[in-house]
Amino acid sequence: GLKDWWNKHKDKIVEVVKDSGKAGLNAA
């Protein structure tokens, strides 16, 4: 289910979100 998918991918998702946030701040 969704919870299993999230648990499997959350570390990667968090990294991507952090990188996106940094890129957004740097571009601003």
From Swiss-Prot:
MF GO annotations: toxin activity
Modified residues (Alanine amide): A28
CC per GO annotation: extracellular region
Keyword Secreted attached: yes
Compartments where located: Secreted
Main localization (coarse): secreted
One example of a Gene Ontology biological process annotation: defense response to bacterium
Keywords: Amidation, Antibiotic, Antimicrobial, Secreted, Toxin
Superkingdom of the source species: Eukaryota
Statement: the UniProt record of this protein carries the keyword Secreted: yes
Tissue: Expressed by the venom gland.
Function summary: The synthetic peptide has weak antimicrobial activity against Gram-negative bacterium E.coli ATCC 10536. It does not show antimicrobial activity against the Gram-positive bacteria B.amyloliquefacies S499, L.monocytogenes 2231 and S.aureus ATCC 29213, against the Gram-negative bacteria P.putida BTP1 and P.aeruginosa PaO1, or against the fungi S.cerevisiae, R.mucilaginosa, C.cucumerinum, F.oxysporum and B.cinerea.
Protein name, per record: M-poneritoxin-Dq4a
Gene source species: Dinoponera quadriceps (South American ant)
